[in-house]
């Protein structure tokens, strides 16, 4: 029996990340090689012509799984009946802009998109916020879409998670698929804490802790962390454009693991609504280690946290509280 198509919304679809993401979705990388999709693409009126060009290319690519394309500048039309929403559209910070100006632009975008999703998306729609500030945009979306279950609103820290896997893999010259269970704690910003204390590598004699194999705590506690934290800026410097290919790929990873499930014994990082686990204040969207089963994520409990980790986890929580306060001040 062929599966019913899943409707996937991508906002900011004419942008760089959108252009990298929509073919991945249409190829089955996000939801599986046997899952038909209908793509809903939303962008601002200024980008309408470019958006139509992306639609033309999707038609030209003749993707067997792609059963339809909606390309629109109307949020209601874009959100109607969607099962998965990937929120890539946002207002990027430009030179000379204050944080509050950027925040206030994004608060108004996410407030209006929240109400369109709440009124028109399919029940149990899963939402992934990619646009920065991702954690706080997701929090605003949650506030203004109260009927969407809070467990269905997440933000992307899988890009940071994958960057951390990549750094360990390069350092040890092992395939990245042999490295697992790094953790990104906190905000998708330069205060995030990439943690390898629970990470392992598959070797010929079983799984070994990353710390034991790297044998260089100075690197793991220093350069490794700063490289992952600053990787986005390094890519902008090299490419003169922000990371799009890796962001799109990690968005697919995030949704796929959420929908299909994580492999036994593996956890991944997702920005989710805090319930107070690991003494992270409730009411923030914070990146935690999670496992996924039957379309639901669960925070991994009981991992030992050392003092150095605690400090870094608290620091990024503090930044998220400040961002939350700033966002709320834009609302009043």
UniProtKB/Swiss-Prot annotation:
Residues of the active site: 188 (proton acceptor)
Source organism, top-level taxon: Eukaryota
Residues given in the record as NAD(+) binding sites: 16-17, 43, 90, 113, 132
Keyword NAD: yes
Cross-link (Glycyl lysine isopeptide (Lys-Gly) (interchain with G-Cter in ubiquitin)): 119
Keywords, sorted A to Z: Cytoplasm, Isopeptide bond, NAD, Oxidoreductase, Tricarboxylic acid cycle, Ubl conjugation
Chief location: cytoplasm
Record-listed E.C. numbers: 1.1.1.37
Residues given in the record as oxaloacetate binding sites: 99, 132, 163, 188, 243
GO cellular component: cytosol; plasma membrane; plasmodesma; plastid
Record flagged with keyword Transcription regulation: no
GO BP annotations, alphabetical order: malate metabolic process; tricarboxylic acid cycle
Reactions catalysed: (S)-malate + NAD(+) = oxaloacetate + NADH + H(+)
Entry-linked InterPro entries: L-lactate/malate_DH (IPR001557), Lactate/malate_DH_C (IPR022383), Lactate/malate_DH_N (IPR001236), Lactate_DH/Glyco_Ohase_4_C (IPR015955), Malate_DH_AS (IPR001252), Malate_DH_NAD-dep_euk (IPR011274), Malate_DH_type2 (IPR010945), NAD(P)-bd_dom_sf (IPR036291)
GO molecular function annotations of the record: L-malate dehydrogenase (NAD+) activity
CDD domains named in the record: MDH_cytoplasmic_cytosolic (cd01336)
Alphabetical list of Pfam families matching this protein: Ldh_1_C, Ldh_1_N
Oligomeric and partner information: Homodimer. Interacts with 14-3-3-like proteins GRF1 GRF3 and GRF8.
Family that this chain belongs to: Belongs to the LDH/MDH superfamily. MDH type 2 family.
Function in brief: Catalyzes a reversible NAD-dependent dehydrogenase reaction involved in central metabolism and redox homeostasis between organelle compartments.
The protein's name in its UniProt record: Malate dehydrogenase 2, cytoplasmic
Organism: Arabidopsis thaliana
Taxonomic placement: Eukaryota, Viridiplantae, Streptophyta, Embryophyta, Tracheophyta
